[in-house]
Amino acid sequence: MNQSSPITFCISTWNNLPYLKLAIQSVRKNSYYKDAPFIIHAENCTDGTDEWLEQNSDQYDLTYFIEKNEIPAGIGGGMNFCADRVTTDYIMFLHSDFYVTKDWDKSCYDEMQKHSEPTWVFSHRIEPNMFNSPQRPGTVIVPKDTFGAYY
C-alpha cells in the first residue's frame, strides 16, 4: 500500500472531454500515489465535461469545480483556482490532454527530494512528429511505430 500522498494533481480544462477522460484515467491508473487528491477546474464547458465530471467524480475520486464566467479566467486562472485549494506540499499541474506513464508522479517527487532549495520540476512532451516540426521546444520526437496505442 502506498503512503499518503504529498502531491495534489490539478487540471484546468475547457471543452476537451475526450482527452480529459484519458488524462484522468491515466493519472489514476499509472500514478504511484493512487489516492492523491485530484482537483479539476472546468470553465465554460459546453461539450459534456460538466456532466461527465458530475457522473464520474466518485469513480475517480475527483474534487471538481464548474465555473461559468462571462470573462474567462483561462488555463492560468484555472490553475491558480486549483492551487488555492491544495493542502499538500506539492502540486502537479497537468494539461487535460496529457497521458501519464507508470509512477510518473513518484519519479518527479523523488527528483524534487534531491534539492534543498525550492525546485521546479517539469517534463518533456513525447510524441511522434505530428506537426512536421522536429525542433519544437520541450518536445522529444519518437518514431510513430514506437509511440503506442494513442497515436
List where the protein language model places each region:
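A recurrent flexible, glycine/aromatic-enriched loop bordering the glycosyltransferase active site
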Residues: Q135-Y151
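Short aromatic/hydrophobic "clamp" motif used to bind/position activated sugar donors
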Residues: I91
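Short, acidic, metal-binding catalytic loop of nucleotide-sugar glycosyltransferases
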Residues: Q25-D35
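Conserved donor NDP-sugar-binding/catalytic core segment of glycosyltransferases
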Residues: Y99, D103-P137
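Cell-envelope/extracellular polymer assembly enzymes that use nucleotide-activated donors
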Residues: P6-T8, P37
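Glycine-rich, basic loop-to-helix element that forms the pyrophosphate-binding segment
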Residues: N69-V86
